[in-house]
Amino acid sequence: MDTVAPLLPLLADRLEPLRRRLCNRYGMDRLEVFGSAAKGLFDPVRSDLDFIVQMTGQREPGYARRFCSFADELAALLGRPVDLLTESMIRNPYFRKDVDATRRLLLEL
């Protein structure tokens, strides 16, 4: 798995604000990008951004609210629609194979 460096200026320019504003607030431990942005096929007009997040406290009350709020704020910060998944949401083996082939680490705390 490669770390994102020149992946997408949109992401690279916002990594530090993302870490400061969102990661600590929502208990995010790890954030990866996959799909068109990770493959270099990102279309600035039509593409959304696909992420896999690992957050603390998945069994704690309020986790679903934190997850949804994180997704909303991530979209606002990036100015694009986002699809946010966790590892446990990726159950289809064909989808898993595609995700695993393209995923790139953005942040790990």
Where are these regions (language model features)?
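Short, aliphatic-rich beta-strand segments
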Residues: 50-53
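Catalytic core of pol beta-like nucleotidyltransferases
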Residues: 1-32, 38-45, 56-109
